[in-house]
Amino acid sequence: MERFRLASDYEPRGDQPRAIAELSEGIVRGDRDQVLLGVTGSGKTFTMANVIAAVNRPALVLAPNKTLAAQLYGEFRELFPDNAVEYFVSYYDYYQPEAYIPTTDTFIEKDSSINDEIDKLRHAATRSLLTRRDVIIVASVSCIYGIGSPAEYQAMHIFFHQGDEYGRDELLRKLVDIQYERNDLDFHRGTFRVRGDIVEIFPAHEGERAYRIEFFGDTVDAISEIDPLRGVVVQRLTKCAVYPASHYVATRETLDRAMEEIRTDLRERLQWFRERNMLVEAQRLEQRTMFDLEMMEEMGFCQGIENYSRYFDGRTPGEPPYTLLDYFPRDFILFVDESHITVSQVGGMYRGDRSRKETLVNYGFRLPAALDNRPLTFGEFTERLNQSVYVSATPADYELQQSGGVVVEQVIRPTGLLDPVIEVRPATEQVDDLLHEVRETTARGERVLVTTLTKRMAEDLTDYYRDLGVRVRYLHSDIDTIQRMQIIRDLRMGEFDVLVGINLLREGLDIPEVSLVAILDADKEGFLRSARSLIQTCGRAARNVNGRVIMYADTVTGSMQSCLDETARRRALQEAFNTEHGITPQTVKKGLRTILESIEERDYYTVAAVAETREEYISADEIPKRVKKLRKEMLDAAKKLEFERAADLRDQIKKLEEMELRLR
């Protein structure tokens, strides 16, 4: 059996050896849920890697967004170069789900842009799970959405050895059945080309290698792995497996059965509409469904085939879909990174998806079976788990309840770094006081993070400091991930010194050059100033030996006191350990590398070098265009359950509409 081989020049240090031993023993013992409370910079990823290597079982690492997933993917690939480390996130660069708005009788057609690189990585992930056990999949919550039956996916793959009796034409038919496209001119992933008795296949899970199958009559004469660009042979093979180009594939028998069930359900639904005199809905449903059936009959596929997945999977109404979790063997281990965020994300996906699809079904755009093309409910998700390890610096109540309150602590950092010193100062003159601290800190070549409560405050503070000569930028929710990564890289390289943000300076911001974190209006109780948020924000200063935090507040709230107490407790443990072992704290040394540069996404945000265009400078003629753009962004944000951003956009729209009335 394949084993995980951990490749690292480092040995576990600090609290890591104890945490690795306790978690590994818990898994072997059969503990269903465990919690790893690991402070920022304590090497939680390295601990997870050691646990995986120790228990030698397939693992799913669940991250709260694509950015952190990409970071973890890069780190695990470095730690396990000889094993299958895969990446499974949503493959959409842009996604507009189909929707119907009854009040305006507006149907919005599905529109999307698929990232080919991520699609390749998704196929590589499912292929690895079906062919080996030394697999680590790093995923976002995309893993709870339906992707088709693993049994059908496995059954439809093509496997042959050199010397097999296998006709060339038979191979071509099978390739078409599993959604490969013949293209003799543009050879790319998911296509094949034919040159006499030679068939070349570009597998869906590959980006740089293709297969060449040479026939002699009806015999497989030779199999080679080739460079698809140059056409040269890389290596000779004795066997070869080609997996489907889509996760939604089915045998001809399954397809015929599914189409018959669709026709039966269509007849019943049409009768239901007609009995209620809903003739427009009946005509609409019949036209759309019959078109899809014709496409399935001819091509074995249709646009939006995922809405019929229940029929292909043989599921009953209401039964959960097959997801990535069903591709794992039963004994897999789940690691939930930043669990205080990720767990709640899993729970929220089902409800938003359901309400949109119910409208489509009620107005005749989809059969009721479309409701079963959905993410898992939270209960269905937990039913599919074997053993879980929740990883966070601030575990939430759910995780603690699941583990019975038992927590494996990882408070001591391998670098000997202490939690930052926290100082509370009055908020009355916070801007000018912070300016003095910023100048002192940047004079030493160190960086500063500043977190505010509102976008306007972030903008105004940035403008004010920039006018005074401070090299400053700010993070806000209109900036996409690629820009965000570039901004953080620029901060680390010293292109600027101060980064201002709102709720974006918490999890996953790994910047060792930052020695000062300033929290403005720290005494304003709420989501952004909860104890958990404050601890996470303070953690951004924990990778620098000079790390410190200034909370600007006129009173010490309960959340602030909890943060102060927890930080003091951790510092006491860390100082005692360093004294006992003669350790001198050292700032984390981290290279400026970019992970997974080809991947684009929209889960996190970056910063513009200048503030956005203010409403005051918009002419009356420009306002309608601006309102239309903002309204679309607001609806998109609401669909993604980003209600804080949607509310902010709503307020901007209201201001612009009021301004238009004044100007006209």
From Swiss-Prot:
HAMAP family: UvrB. Signal peptide: none annotated. This is UvrABC system protein B. InterPro entries: Helicase/UvrB_N, Helicase_ATP-bd, Helicase_C-like, P-loop_NTPase, UVR_dom, UVR_dom_sf, UvrB, UvrB_inter. Residues 25-414 form the Helicase ATP-binding domain. SUPFAM superfamilies: C-terminal UvrC-binding domain of UvrB, P-loop containing nucleoside triphosphate hydrolases. The beta-hairpin motif is involved in DNA binding. CDD domains: DEXHc_UvrB (cd17916), SF2_C_UvrB (cd18790). Residues 430-596 form the Helicase C-terminal domain. The keyword Nucleus does not apply. It is found in: Cytoplasm. A motif (Beta-hairpin) lies at residues 91-114. GO terms for cellular component: cytoplasm; excinuclease repair complex. It holds the Pfam family UvrB. The UvrABC repair system catalyzes the recognition and processing of DNA lesions. A damage recognition complex composed of 2 UvrA and 2 UvrB subunits scans DNA for abnormalities. Upon binding of the UvrA(2)B(2) complex to a putative damaged site, the DNA wraps around one UvrB monomer. DNA wrap is dependent on ATP binding by UvrB and probably causes local melting of the DNA helix, facilitating insertion of UvrB beta-hairpin between the DNA strands. Then UvrB probes one DNA strand for the presence of a lesion.
